[in-house]
Amino acid sequence: MEIEKLNLYRDTNWNDIKLRFCGHSECLPLHSYGPGTRPYYLMHFVLSGKGRLVVNKTEYQITENQLFLVEPDQMVFYQADKEDPWTYSWVGFNGKLAPYFMHRLGFGYPSLTKELSTEVFEEIKDLLDILISIKNNNTKNDLYTNGILLLLLSKVGTFIEDSKELPERKSRQNSESHVQRAISIVEDFYGRDLTVQYIADKL
Protein backbone atom coordinates (compact mmCIF):
# COMPACT_ATOMS: atom_id res chain seq x y z
CA MET A 1 0.00 0.00 0.00
CA GLU A 2 1.33 3.43 -0.92
CA ILE A 3 1.96 5.77 2.00
CA GLU A 4 1.25 9.42 1.26
CA LYS A 5 1.14 12.62 3.30
CA LEU A 6 -0.22 15.87 1.92
CA ASN A 7 -0.35 19.36 3.37
CA LEU A 8 -2.41 22.05 1.63
CA TYR A 9 -1.86 25.74 2.33
CA ARG A 10 -4.48 28.42 2.04
CA ASP A 11 -4.37 30.88 -0.81
CA THR A 12 -2.77 34.21 0.06
CA ASN A 13 -2.52 37.57 -1.67
CA TRP A 14 1.22 37.17 -2.18
CA ASN A 15 1.82 37.25 -5.91
CA ASP A 16 5.62 36.98 -6.18
CA ILE A 17 6.02 33.35 -5.09
CA LYS A 18 3.83 31.29 -2.81
CA LEU A 19 3.73 27.76 -1.48
CA ARG A 20 0.56 25.89 -2.46
CA PHE A 21 1.17 22.48 -0.89
CA CYS A 22 3.78 19.90 0.02
CA GLY A 23 3.72 16.16 0.42
CA HIS A 24 5.55 12.88 0.86
CA SER A 25 5.04 9.56 -0.93
CA GLU A 26 6.48 6.09 -0.44
CA CYS A 27 5.51 4.79 -3.86
CA LEU A 28 4.56 1.28 -4.85
CA PRO A 29 6.48 -0.42 -7.70
CA LEU A 30 5.57 1.13 -11.07
CA HIS A 31 3.33 3.76 -9.45
CA SER A 32 3.02 6.56 -12.00
CA TYR A 33 1.54 9.92 -12.86
CA GLY A 34 0.50 10.97 -16.34
CA PRO A 35 0.85 11.66 -19.07
CA GLY A 36 -0.59 14.86 -17.67
CA THR A 37 0.08 18.48 -16.77
CA ARG A 38 0.15 20.57 -13.61
CA PRO A 39 -0.91 24.23 -13.33
CA TYR A 40 2.03 25.08 -11.04
CA TYR A 41 5.67 24.23 -10.38
CA LEU A 42 6.16 20.89 -8.64
CA MET A 43 9.64 20.12 -7.30
CA HIS A 44 10.29 16.52 -6.20
CA PHE A 45 13.14 15.46 -3.92
CA VAL A 46 13.98 11.75 -4.21
CA LEU A 47 14.87 10.47 -0.75
CA SER A 48 15.46 6.84 -1.72
CA GLY A 49 14.90 4.42 -4.57
CA LYS A 50 14.67 5.39 -8.21
CA GLY A 51 12.30 6.05 -11.07
CA ARG A 52 12.01 7.76 -14.41
CA LEU A 53 10.70 11.04 -15.78
CA VAL A 54 9.59 11.52 -19.39
CA VAL A 55 9.18 15.00 -20.89
CA ASN A 56 8.84 15.69 -24.63
CA LYS A 57 10.10 12.16 -25.42
CA THR A 58 13.22 12.81 -23.31
CA GLU A 59 13.62 10.22 -20.56
CA TYR A 60 15.50 10.94 -17.32
CA GLN A 61 16.62 8.24 -14.89
CA ILE A 62 16.22 9.66 -11.38
CA THR A 63 17.86 8.25 -8.26
CA GLU A 64 18.39 9.06 -4.58
CA ASN A 65 19.66 12.57 -3.76
CA GLN A 66 18.31 13.97 -7.01
CA LEU A 67 15.47 16.39 -7.57
CA PHE A 68 13.30 16.91 -10.60
CA LEU A 69 11.05 19.78 -11.56
CA VAL A 70 7.68 19.65 -13.29
CA GLU A 71 6.94 22.99 -14.94
CA PRO A 72 3.44 24.47 -15.29
CA ASP A 73 1.39 23.09 -18.19
CA GLN A 74 4.22 20.79 -19.23
CA MET A 75 3.14 17.31 -20.36
CA VAL A 76 4.98 14.80 -18.17
CA PHE A 77 5.01 11.16 -17.18
CA TYR A 78 6.89 9.84 -14.18
CA GLN A 79 7.02 6.37 -12.70
CA ALA A 80 8.58 4.53 -9.78
CA ASP A 81 11.03 1.73 -10.51
CA LYS A 82 9.72 -1.83 -10.45
CA GLU A 83 12.46 -3.23 -8.20
CA ASP A 84 13.45 -0.18 -6.16
CA PRO A 85 10.51 2.28 -6.16
CA TRP A 86 11.30 5.79 -5.08
CA THR A 87 10.24 7.64 -1.99
CA TYR A 88 10.04 11.38 -2.52
CA SER A 89 8.80 14.60 -1.00
CA TRP A 90 7.59 17.52 -3.06
CA VAL A 91 6.61 21.17 -2.93
CA GLY A 92 4.11 22.88 -5.22
CA PHE A 93 4.38 26.62 -5.77
CA ASN A 94 3.59 29.41 -8.21
CA GLY A 95 3.74 33.19 -8.49
CA LYS A 96 4.80 35.80 -11.01
CA LEU A 97 8.47 35.54 -9.98
CA ALA A 98 8.57 31.74 -9.91
CA PRO A 99 9.62 31.44 -13.60
CA TYR A 100 12.40 33.98 -13.00
CA PHE A 101 13.72 32.11 -9.95
CA MET A 102 13.62 28.74 -11.72
CA HIS A 103 15.46 30.16 -14.71
CA ARG A 104 18.15 31.66 -12.46
CA LEU A 105 18.55 28.28 -10.76
CA GLY A 106 19.21 26.69 -14.14
CA PHE A 107 15.90 24.90 -14.62
CA GLY A 108 14.02 24.70 -17.89
CA TYR A 109 13.58 21.95 -20.44
CA PRO A 110 15.70 19.93 -21.06
CA SER A 111 17.44 20.77 -17.76
CA LEU A 112 14.86 19.51 -15.27
CA THR A 113 16.96 17.45 -12.84
CA LYS A 114 19.73 18.27 -10.38
CA GLU A 115 21.89 16.09 -8.17
CA LEU A 116 22.61 17.45 -4.69
CA SER A 117 25.17 16.49 -2.08
CA THR A 118 24.09 14.25 0.78
CA GLU A 119 24.69 17.10 3.23
CA VAL A 120 22.45 19.54 1.35
CA PHE A 121 19.82 16.87 0.86
CA GLU A 122 19.70 16.22 4.61
CA GLU A 123 19.15 19.94 5.24
CA ILE A 124 16.36 20.00 2.68
CA LYS A 125 14.74 16.91 4.21
CA ASP A 126 14.60 18.71 7.56
CA LEU A 127 12.86 21.69 5.92
CA LEU A 128 10.38 19.39 4.16
CA ASP A 129 9.59 17.64 7.44
CA ILE A 130 8.77 21.01 9.00
CA LEU A 131 6.47 21.94 6.12
CA ILE A 132 4.61 18.64 6.32
CA SER A 133 4.18 18.95 10.09
CA ILE A 134 2.50 22.40 10.04
CA LYS A 135 -1.28 21.99 10.16
CA ASN A 136 -2.83 25.30 11.20
CA ASN A 137 -3.50 27.90 8.52
CA ASN A 138 -2.97 31.36 9.99
CA THR A 139 -0.97 34.46 9.14
CA LYS A 140 1.98 33.41 11.29
CA ASN A 141 2.23 30.04 9.58
CA ASP A 142 1.68 31.61 6.16
CA LEU A 143 4.81 33.66 6.72
CA TYR A 144 6.69 30.71 8.19
CA THR A 145 5.90 28.21 5.43
CA ASN A 146 6.61 30.65 2.61
CA GLY A 147 9.88 31.54 4.31
CA ILE A 148 10.84 27.86 4.42
CA LEU A 149 10.06 27.52 0.71
CA LEU A 150 12.41 30.41 -0.05
CA LEU A 151 15.10 28.93 2.21
CA LEU A 152 14.72 25.55 0.51
CA LEU A 153 15.09 27.08 -2.96
CA SER A 154 18.04 29.11 -1.70
CA LYS A 155 19.83 25.95 -0.54
CA VAL A 156 19.25 24.34 -3.92
CA GLY A 157 20.52 27.46 -5.68
CA THR A 158 23.58 27.84 -3.47
CA PHE A 159 24.66 24.25 -4.08
CA ILE A 160 24.15 24.55 -7.84
CA GLU A 161 26.04 27.85 -8.00
CA ASP A 162 28.92 26.55 -5.87
CA SER A 163 29.17 23.43 -8.04
CA LYS A 164 29.37 25.55 -11.18
CA GLU A 165 32.02 27.82 -9.70
CA LEU A 166 34.37 25.15 -8.38
CA PRO A 167 36.25 24.48 -11.67
CA GLU A 168 36.39 28.21 -12.43
CA ARG A 169 37.55 29.01 -8.91
CA LYS A 170 40.23 26.34 -9.07
CA SER A 171 41.45 27.66 -12.42
CA ARG A 172 41.54 31.21 -11.08
CA GLN A 173 43.49 30.10 -8.00
CA ASN A 174 46.02 28.29 -10.20
CA SER A 175 46.41 31.38 -12.38
CA GLU A 176 46.94 33.61 -9.36
CA SER A 177 49.53 31.16 -8.00
CA HIS A 178 51.50 31.28 -11.26
CA VAL A 179 51.40 35.07 -11.31
CA GLN A 180 52.71 35.29 -7.76
CA ARG A 181 55.47 32.78 -8.57
CA ALA A 182 56.51 34.79 -11.64
CA ILE A 183 56.65 37.98 -9.56
CA SER A 184 58.85 36.22 -7.00
CA ILE A 185 61.26 35.03 -9.70
CA VAL A 186 61.58 38.53 -11.14
CA GLU A 187 62.21 39.97 -7.67
CA ASP A 188 64.82 37.30 -6.84
CA PHE A 189 66.70 37.81 -10.09
CA TYR A 190 66.25 41.56 -10.35
CA GLY A 191 69.21 43.17 -12.13
CA ARG A 192 70.11 40.01 -14.03
CA ASP A 193 69.31 39.13 -17.60
CA LEU A 194 65.90 37.41 -17.57
CA THR A 195 63.97 35.96 -20.46
CA VAL A 196 60.34 34.90 -20.70
CA GLN A 197 61.49 31.34 -21.40
CA TYR A 198 63.59 31.32 -18.22
CA ILE A 199 60.62 32.42 -16.10
CA ALA A 200 58.38 29.83 -17.80
CA ASP A 201 60.89 27.07 -17.05
CA LYS A 202 60.89 28.04 -13.38
CA LEU A 203 57.08 27.96 -13.03
Protein language model annotation of sequence segments:
Residues 18, 42-45, 94-97, 123-127, ...:
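Amphipathic, well-ordered alpha-helical segments in soluble domains
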Residues 12, 26-29, 50, 72, ...:
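A general structural signal marking secondary-structure boundaries and capping sites
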Residues 109-122, 134-146, 153-203:
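Short, Lys/Arg-enriched, Trp-marked, Pro/Gly-tolerant hinge/linker segments that flank
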Residues 73-97:
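Ligand-binding loop in jelly-roll beta-barrel domains
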